[in-house]
A protein has these predicted regions:
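Active-site glycine/GP-rich loop and adjacent strand/helix microenvironment
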Residues: 57-60, 86, 93, 149-156, ...
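PAPS-dependent sulfotransferases, especially Golgi type II membrane carbohydrate sulfotransferases
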Residues: 101-208
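Conserved phosphate-donor/acceptor-positioning beta-strand/loop module used by diverse small-molecule
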Residues: 59-61, 70-95
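PAPS-dependent sulfation machinery
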Residues: 1-56
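N-terminal cationic-hydrophobic initiation segments that often serve targeting/anchoring roles
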Residues: 48, 71, 167-171
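Short catalytic-loop micro-motif centered on adjacent basic/acidic residues
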Residues: 55-59, 177-179
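Short alpha-helical
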Residues: 64-65, 88, 185
């Protein structure tokens, strides 16, 4: 199970079009929203104080399209992008989408809860990240004609091509690409040799 920070509720409160799939959902570096930046850091500081912690970690898939903006807000931020073998990843996504869609059919309240918590990745009313309008239109066409597997494959390609561009554009001290399979095969070694030093968590006294 993956813990969710439920950060998306905050983002949606300050950016109205984050999940408008008719436009690109990317927040560029020149994004201006003083109210959000003030509230966001107040929120983080509140959590750190409440938990007597020094570092804040969030698991948020949508933030991949906000990294330029987030790094402008805090240039010491670290982003870890996980990439998984496309065949197994797409198979997993298709399975999850079917599970959530069936849940929404049986109990519409589950769909409402997902929307309230800022999750639109799966289910009957999914809203995917629009990174490129032309590509996204073709993806939607595949979904509309029932070609879900092809649609998800095209979506995977769009998202991870964008991730590749981020790795090339952003400082290596801020963004790291990690293979999901490496983490699964040897989690302790992977964490110690990669994530621990990249963040760097050893500075806050974390021991494994």
């Amino acid at each position: 199970k993956s813990p969710e920070a439920l950060e998306e509720i905050l983002w949606e409160s300050f950016f109205a079009d984050l999940h408008n799939d008719n436009i690109e959902n990317i927040l560029p570096e020149n994004t201006q929203n003083k109210e959000f930046s003030q509230f966001y850091f107040q929120h983080i500081n509140k959590l750190l104080l409440a938990r007597s912690s020094k570092r804040y970690v969030t698991k948020a898939n949508y933030n991949i399209t906000r990294l330029h903006y987030l790094l402008k807000l805090n240039n010491s931020s670290k982003a870890i992008i996980m990439v998984r073998d496309p065949v197994s990843h797409i198979n997993s996504i298709v399975r999850q989408d079917r599970i959530f869609s069936e849940s929404h059919r049986k109990n519409p309240k589950t769909k409402h809860f997902m929307h309230m918590s800022g999750h639109y990745e799966f289910g009957l009313d999914k809203k995917l990240i629009n990174i490129d309008v032309e590509k996204f239109t073709k993806i939607q066409k595949q979904f509309n004609t029932g070609n879900d597997i092809k649609a998800w494959a095209m979506y995977w390609s769009m998202v991870y091509n964008y991730a590749k561009s981020l790795i090339e554009q952003l400082p290596k001290s801020n963004v790291m690409l990690c293979r999901y399979e490496d983490l699964c095969n040897d989690p302790k070694n992977f964490f110690c040799q990669s994530i621990l030093f990249f963040c760097p968590l050893f500075l806050v006294g974390l021991h494994i």
